[in-house]
A protein has these predicted regions:
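Basic/aromatic-rich interaction segments and small domains that mediate binding to polyanionic partners
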Residues: 25, 31-82
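A short, charged, amphipathic alpha-helix used as a generic interaction element across diverse proteins
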Residues: 77-80, 119-138
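Short, structured interface segments
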Residues: 79-99
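Short aromatic-glycine-(Arg/Gly/Cys) micro-motifs in beta-strand/loop hairpins
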Residues: 97-113
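Short, mixed-charge low-complexity intrinsically disordered segments
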Residues: 136-153
Length: 153
């Protein structure tokens, strides 16, 4: 089911995999540049952060961040690709999956922001990941059954 950027911001849980599309048809493979541009506008990622709207002298709309992937080799990340969307974005979004009940989210929090760092199968795996990566402000949150049912609908 396609939805709006505002709905993703309001309803999708951290860790959800989200696909975004602009509604244009995919060009044939032989048109390399057109296909590359289309892939930039039509992709997917994991919801890692929400930022509230800014107020004051230079207001800005609320945003959310989708993590598209990491690039590197030998277990070393060289480049991490994320994309920020404003809630007024005109593309269509679709939640393709959410973390299952019992999954553990490693979350870093500061002020009124929460950023997802990792999704693990359970608390023990999340604690191991946290020990290996050493984020000092991070904590583990367990995904509940009710939250998953509400967000996946």
């Amino acid at each position: 089911m396609n939805t709006t950027a505002q709905s993703i911001y309001d309803e999708a849980p951290l860790g959800a995999h989200i696909r975004f599309i602009d509604g244009t048809p995919r060009p044939p493979e032989r048109f390399k540049r057109k296909l590359s541009a289309w892939k930039e506008r039509n992709s997917a990622g994991q919801l890692t952060q929400r930022s509230p709207a800014g107020t004051g002298s230079s207001p800005c709309p609320a945003t959310f961040t989708l993590h598209e992937g990491n690039f590197g080799s030998g277990g070393i990340v060289i480049l991490s690709v994320s994309r920020i969307f404003v809630v007024t974005d005109q593309r269509r979004f679709e939640v393709t999956s959410v973390p299952p009940p019992g999954a553990a989210l490693v979350v870093q929090a500061w002020d009124d922001h929460r950023e997802l760092l990792h999704v693990a199968q359970d608390r023990a795996a999340a604690e191991v990941w946290l020990q290996q990566h050493g984020y000092h402000r991070a904590h583990v949150e367990i995904v509940g059954e009710a939250e998953t049912l509400i967000k996946a609908a």
